[in-house]
Amino acid sequence: MLLPGLLLLLLLLLLAGTRWLWGQWKLWKLRLPPLAPGFLHFLQPNLPVYLFGLAQKLGPIYRIRLGLQDVVVLNSNKTIEEALIQKWVDFAGRPQILDGKMNFDLSMGDYSLTWKAHKKLSRSALVLGMRDSMEPLVEQLTQEFCERMRAQAGASVAIHKEFSLLTCSIISCLTFGDKQDSTLLNATHSCVRDLLKAWNHWSVQILDIIPFLRFFPNPGLWKLKQFQESRDHIVMQELKRHKDSLVAGQWKDMIDYMLQGVEKQRDARDPGQLHERHVHMSVVDLFVGGTETTAATLSWAVAFLLHHPEIQKRLQEELDLKLAPSSQLLYKNRMQLPLLMATIAEVLRLRPVVPMALPHRATKASSISGYDIPKDTIIIPNIQGANLDEMVWELPSKFWPDRFLESGKSPRIPTFGCGARVCLGEPLARLEFFVVLARLLQTFTLLPPPDGTLPSLQPLPYTGINLLIPPFQVRLQPRNLAPQDQGQKSSTG
């Protein structure tokens, strides 16, 4: 009995070895991007900048080892746009990751007819379903935020947490409808922050590099699953509440809109059937992808303006000239505030929402910049690295909003990704940047705390999705514009 078992084992080893050699032989025939030596690249503390440094030696496209596979890193706008715009179908896939709800997830779901239907419904719910209410909602909640900050009477404030609560509240109203009571909102906000903190922990991130470690005891992974259960409980309760009160042809929020969209698609028997779980994961993606990311960008903007009070003063002069405090702030008229829009663009260039876009997967054999890219290769666009390219940007590390005021001088920045995988929440995030910063600078002067300490502009060690700023405090000094001056200002409405 022992001999047949050994023969079977040898046969399996022979087949595995033959398959590996066949795969290597096929790769030897290809013109692959250069391979960066070493195995510990993803353990670097400031990963996007480190990867861009490798590009200075190897070129804008190269390979690095990630566990047992190679990953291709793109470090220039040209290579990113070729892959994600010109050849978007070839690179629209997603690799399998730790969170396994791949058939229902939007941000990490693989490319398919179902995924396309899911993306179309979710984007329609945000852009069309909430078209008339999204802008007034952001304005209202921002005004309430400013009133809360005014009550601080110039005291030092941990601004990131306040921004995070604001963005969570906006998403909550868009998805769940009526404003949540403070207890439920705080519970939702804490759940989202805890979930992201657990996800970004090294003990979880390493599982995508060394997958077999997930079979060993891992307190970090256990915490992540606990927070996922809490998240799902909150969303499922809201789905049930919405189904119980749903009226055909009417909607008050995104969940209503998407639930009816799923029913219509089911009745029409369209390809790529959607289910209630897809609605669930759309809500999850909005909270996870739109709370801390937007709050982090707003925090970076405040930090840069504390370091550059002269730019803050120019922004306030622009707002005082073009926008009366009591006037309606319309996003369609945003170009009446060119310096504000340039400042937002510069913050997004230096500190992009997601510095390294979520990984893509080659759905077929293709090429980028003349290099062969085999099917199923993982592609990582290094957006922050591309934004630091001296061949494209003058003084790329300098905070200089005026670069965007020079006509024709500023290339497109793929801050929210591009092509089929462009971020679902981009319209909401851009609206929030515009409204929150406009109202904040119109209402307050940003000052350092009494001891004069300025925030660090160096990101925390990069281990997850977001580029996080070290905690800091700011004083929001009310400006108290004179009523007679306010009446002389024009309106962007």
Curated annotation (Swiss-Prot):
It is an enzyme of class 1 (oxidoreductase). It is a peripheral membrane protein. The keyword Oxidoreductase applies. InterPro entries: Cyt_P450, Cyt_P450_CS, Cyt_P450_E_grp-I, Cyt_P450_sf. Pfam families: p450 (PF00067). One of its GO terms (biological process) is cellular response to peptide hormone stimulus. It is found in: Endoplasmic reticulum membrane; Microsome membrane. Heme b binds at residues 94, 119, 360, 421, 423. The keyword ATP-binding does not apply. It comes from the Eukaryota. One of its GO terms (cellular component) is endoplasmic reticulum membrane. GO terms for molecular function: 17-hydroxyprogesterone 21-hydroxylase activity; heme binding; iron ion binding; progesterone 21-hydroxylase activity; steroid 21-monooxygenase activity; steroid binding. 17alpha-hydroxyprogesterone binds at residue 231. Its EC number is 1.14.14.16. Keywords: Endoplasmic reticulum, Heme, Iron, Lipid-binding, Membrane, Metal-binding, Microsome, Monooxygenase, Oxidoreductase, Steroid-binding, Steroidogenesis. SUPFAM superfamilies: Cytochrome P450 (SSF48264). Belongs to the cytochrome P450 family. A cytochrome P450 monooxygenase that plays a major role in adrenal steroidogenesis. Mechanistically, uses molecular oxygen inserting one oxygen atom into a substrate, and reducing the second into a water molecule, with two electrons provided by NADPH via cytochrome P450 reductase (CPR; NADPH-ferrihemoprotein reductase). The leucine-rich hydrophobic amino acid N-terminal region probably helps to anchor the protein to the microsomal membrane. This is Steroid 21-hydroxylase.
